[in-house]
Amino acid sequence: MAIIKQGILGGFSNKVGSVVGAGWKGIATMRSLPQSVANPRTTAQVANRSTFAQLAMIGSGILPTIIQPLWNRWAKKMSGYNEWLSVNKKLLDSVGNVVDFVPQAVFANGDLSANATAGTISSAGVVNLTFATELVNAHDAATDEAYVVIAILPQGSQQLNEGKVFGFATGVARSVGTVSVTVDQIEATDKVYSYLMFRSKDGVYRSTTSFKLLDNA
């Protein structure tokens, strides 16, 4: 039982509702008890947490090479990482499965153009992407710098965390028309996905995301 000794504004001891009264060095103190928070584990909630965790794992792996340079400047009231998570989580929720999500994944969401036209993989794991050099939009420039993401998923995989994702800030100019990156963890049966983005040399503009499924025969 709680005892209030000096009226409602005075000192008291023990528990009153969700508040506990006590004393510390002769000073009357009050503290609230922690709320009992349920941790629901419905099928939908478990699935939601799983997809969020998978996206977070991907994002953390490409944070310095892709997300920071292509998201931080444009994020509003949150970090670039959190905005990237938010955009892709909504997209994954809307399409409902990994197979349909992967070709639509967003690694940059800006005004510059990006158009990957072809891609090959060598036996040594070198991925070569060819891209259009035409200046399509008002802010496109020959000096725009290429960014590349390579995603690898085992054949038939339905989980993002079963694969690997690599990000590259290549520094290769749009005018070059081709870029090469090395990924030495590609197995013969893997599905290999590439994403091409650009950022202006002064960092003011970023492009859309151009997706290309690579032939891993």
Whereabouts are the PLM-identified features?
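Charged linear interaction tracts used for macromolecular binding and regulation
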Residues: 74-217
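Long, polar/Ser/Thr-enriched low-complexity segments
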Residues: 1-116
